[in-house]
């Protein structure tokens, strides 16, 4: 594969095509299989839920399954239905091998393209990317099989691309299955949403989170697994980012800094700011701001609810929150501060 950044891949983690195992979403797979077994698989699926929870992994698993599995005629040698119970396809299956190599003719993946002049990914999926599908669907599917399209993410389409997709959904090609990944489905045209079958994936609990992170190549300290799950909010992608950029350490430092309020330890704050200075530390600055927003949101929520979160995301967090957000008014104050800081950071 190329060293170029991929729009559908979290930096430092395996691409979804390289993750044949899906963790924590058995119910979603069961819903798809039930539809498949009953012979009423919808031609377009909208996979929704927070970013990084496994939607793309499910899409690639489903694509692998659909291309590798011949259309069912609804009967076996003895005439009874033959229900399938898993989307698993062996790693040595020709389709699995071709997908890993990026050479499966029955699959087309649509993502934000790479801008050769700017040497970075474009900000949107353009109509030119959708036009590629005309040629893709114009080819005959091998052995009369299916053709699968993955759009990751559909939220990133510009208006022209969205309209081109809508026309395709209104008149779907024969044996075509479209898999749309969406982190924010409200951003999609209502007419696109209405022509898809929506399947929402939930966030992962601590145990599934640790298993999924380990499967993706990360290492989770059992002592910090609960804190990692709390900060990642059930997203494997977010958890991997936190692990690769010392997110737990950064959050612990933010908690310690907030604990010095209202005076605030200015030397400590300056040291944290200096650690984010320079273009080489842009990723760290982005994470610090994101985690500060999380900390302020937890303060605001605790004030509104009248109690600290059940799970501490850092040592001393419960004590800090109980002192700084003891009531509903303090919760509203922290929410207002979060809004001001967020506006200034943009």
Model-derived segments and their meaning:
Residues 117-127, 154, 198:
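Flexible beta-alpha connector loops of hexameric P-loop NTPases
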Residues 159-160, 190:
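Conserved D-loop-proximal element of ABC-family nucleotide-binding domains
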Residues 48, 109-114:
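A short hydrophobic beta-strand->loop->alpha-helix junction that borders the nucleotide-binding pocket
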Residues 138, 163-177:
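Conserved catalytic/switch belt of AAA+ P-loop NTPases
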Residues 1-65, 69-77, 81, 85-88, ...:
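Charged, glycine-rich active-site and insertion segments that engage polyanionic ligands
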Residues 153-157, 169, 185:
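Conserved Walker B
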Residues 31-36, 93, 124-146, 156, ...:
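Conserved alpha-helical scaffold flanking the Walker A/P-loop in AAA+ ATPase domains
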Residues 143-148, 173-179:
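Loop/turn-to-beta-strand initiation segments
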């Amino acid at each position: 594969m190329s060293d170029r950044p991929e729009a559908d891949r979290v930096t430092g983690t395996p691409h979804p095509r390289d993750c044949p195992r899906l963790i924590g979403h058995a119910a979603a797979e069961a819903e798809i299989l039930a539809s498949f077994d009953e012979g009423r698989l919808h031609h377009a699926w909208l996979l929704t839920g927070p970013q990084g929870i496994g939607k793309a992994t499910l899409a690639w698993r489903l694509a692998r399954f659909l291309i590798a599995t011949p259309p069912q005629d609804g009967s076996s040698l003895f005439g009874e239905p033959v229900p399938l119970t898993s989307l698993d396809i062996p790693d040595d299956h020709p389709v699995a091998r071709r997908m890993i190599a990026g050479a499966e003719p029955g699959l087309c993946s649509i993502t934000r393209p790479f801008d050769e002049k700017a040497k970075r990914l474009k900000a949107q999926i353009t109509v030119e990317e959708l036009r590629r599908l005309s040629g893709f669907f114009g080819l005959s599917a091998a052995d009369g099989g299916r053709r699968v399209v993955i759009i990751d993410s559909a939220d990133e389409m510009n208006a022209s691309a969205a309209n081109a997709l809508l026309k395709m959904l209104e008149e779907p090609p024969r044996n075509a299955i479209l898999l749309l990944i969406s982190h924010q489905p409200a951003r999609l045209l209502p007419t696109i949403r209405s022509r898809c079958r929506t399947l929402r994936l939930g966030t992962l609990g601590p145990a599934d989170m640790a298993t999924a992170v380990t499967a993706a190549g990360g290492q989770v300290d059992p002592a910090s697994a609960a804190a990692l799950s709390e900060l990642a909010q059930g997203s494997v992608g977010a958890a991997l980012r936190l692990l690769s950029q010392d997110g737990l350490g950064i959050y612990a430092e933010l908690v310690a800094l907030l604990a010095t309020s209202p005076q605030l330890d200015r030397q400590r704050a300056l040291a944290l700011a200096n650690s984010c200075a320079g273009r080489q530390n842009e990723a760290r600055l982005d994470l610090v701001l994101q985690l500060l927003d999380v900390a302020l949101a937890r303060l605001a929520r605790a004030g509104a609810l009248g109690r600290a979160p059940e799970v501490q995301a850092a040592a001393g967090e419960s004590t800090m929150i109980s002192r700084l957000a003891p009531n509903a008014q303090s919760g509203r104050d922290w929410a207002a501060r979060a809004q001001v800081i967020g506006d200034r950071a943009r």
